[in-house]
Amino acid sequence: MDYQNNVSEERVAEMIWDAVSEGATLKDVHGIPQDMMDGLYAHAYEFYNQGRLDEAETFFRFLCIYDFYNPDYTMGLAAVCQLKKQFQKACDLYAVAFTLLKNDYRPVFFTGQCQLLMRKAAKARQCFELVNERTEDE
């Protein structure tokens, strides 16, 4: 009986790995509906706005793990890290968000803020100059 459990667990792990390797998210693998993800995001955002950063971080982390293609989740987690003064971690997350957002330079701007707060003025300036060069006045 244990052998069958191990084989089926190995098969499930293999199927999940194949799905993720082909671009599926854990949200897709587990069949989590988008409206549930939207509800979790609403809670995360509410916690963020209330200054309940630990709770917001927990929700945003879950959202990022289950749907790593959604830049809103990554931006949310990065913003939480920025407010918690985890500036390097925030910069790393903003970099991920920027790759997902392509031509949206908000993550670069927020990275510049983090660089300033880490007393890295030259890097901050590079970020702000890039934002200035690549965005149009709206």
Segments and roles (model prediction):
Residues 1-35:
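Long, contiguous interaction/recruitment modules in multidomain scaffold/adaptor proteins
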Residues 34-101:
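Alpha-helical adaptor scaffolds
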Residues 91, 110-114, 135:
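Functionally engaged cysteine thiol sites
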Residues 75, 105-110:
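Non-catalytic amphipathic alpha-helical adaptor/oligomerization segments
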Residues 28-29, 113-116:
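A ubiquitous short alpha-helical element
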Residues 116-138:
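TPR/TPR-like (Sel1-like) alpha-helical repeat modules
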